C-alpha cells in the first residue's frame, strides 16, 4: 500500500509534500598569469595560421587574420592539456568559457563563480569594470574541453558551445534523490540511490515481482499529493509514482509513471503497462520506463505518462483508494 505524501510532511518520509499544498594567492602572480594567457593566445594563433598556410607578417597591427584563428580542433597540431589548463577557473576548477571576462590584471574566473565574488580570487583586485578577453575566446573556440564529469568516467571532449547542453544530460553526472515532491537534496552515484532510499525514505514500500498492484490511498486529499512505491524484478528496481496536481482552479489531474533506478540505456531494455480496471471499464498505458536521471517533471509537462482527471479516478476508485495494476516486461 502506498500512502500519500502531502504538504508539510517530513522530508525523510515518503516524499514530503510540496510546499504550499502543491505538491588565494596574493598579488605576486599577476604579471605571470597575464603573460601566460597572452602567450597561449599567440601560440594558438600562430599554430592555426601555420596550419592554414598563412605566411608572412600582417602589416600594421601585427595581428593574425580572424580566418586563420577560427579553425577546427584538428588544425591545432601538438595541442596539449597544458593549453586547456590555462582556462581552468581558480575557484571551481571547471573551465572558463566564452564570453570570457578578466580582472584588471588579466586573471580569469568563470562566469558562474564571478557572480558570487566581490574581488579577483587570484590577486584580490576588483572584478569591475568587466573586461572582455577576446584573444582567449578565440583560443577557446579552437579547443575541445573535457566534460565536467570526466572524473566520474565521461570520456567526451566538446566544443565550448556544446559542453553545457551535454552536461545537462550526461550519464555520469550525479544522481539526485528521485522522490517527487520531497525536499531531499541528496546527490550520489547510481549505486548509492537504493541505499539512500532505504535509509532516508523508509516509508516507501517495495513489492517483488513483475506484476503488482499499486494501491494509492486517500486520493481525495486536497492539494497536490504524491504516492510512491518501489517494484523489484528482473534484477532491477523501479519507482512507481502517482502524482496529483491542480492544473487550474477546481480541475485536478493525476499522472502515473514508472522510473527505472538505472541509466537511460538500461531503461530501453524494459517496458511497463499501467492499467485501471473496474465496473467493466479499463484504462491502459504502455511505455518505456524513464531513467531517474530524467525524473518525473519532464514527463508530466509533456503528458508522457498515464494522465486522467478526478472524474476518471472516481470511476475506478473504491472508498477513496485507487488500485493500479503495474506490469514490467523485458523487451
From Swiss-Prot:
One of its GO terms (biological process) is rhythmic process. In embryos it is expressed in all blastomeres starting at the mid-blastulla. After 20 somite stage, it is expressed mainly in the posterior part. Expressed in brain, including the eye, the cranial cavity, otic vesicle, optic chiasm and in the gut. A zinc finger (RING-type) spans 89-124. Zn(2+) 2 binds at residues 177, 184, 196, 201. It is an enzyme of class 2 (transferase). A zinc finger (SIAH-type) spans 142-202. Homodimer. This is E3 ubiquitin-protein ligase Siah2.
